[in-house]
Amino acid sequence: MGKRKVSILEPAATAVAEIALFIESKGLPQTAKKFVDEAFEFFLKLSDERIEHKPCTYNQWKNLKYRCVSFKKKYVIAYLSQEREIVVCDFVSAKLLK
């Protein structure tokens, strides 16, 4: 029982940064920083090998064998779960997947 390595792909990191930039543009720089910190802390929590989330229902992600988890009820994180590594592949608004 332990932790797996967490790798974050560029599309996921870029999506978090774009959301933070939007929050900051609304005059909320501390909120933007907090959002980024919370998102990346959440990514690291995915490393717990005891936790396995459901496969994604979004067809393109389902075909890629991604697993999905909700973040703050507004976003979806898509990741690949491997024996020794979690690969965070995407981070999107849940509204875009409907």
What do these predicted ranges mean?
Residues 1-65:
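Basic, Lys/Arg-enriched alpha-helical interface segments
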Residues 61-62, 70-72:
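Short solvent-exposed loop/turn micro-motifs enriched in small/polar/acidic residues
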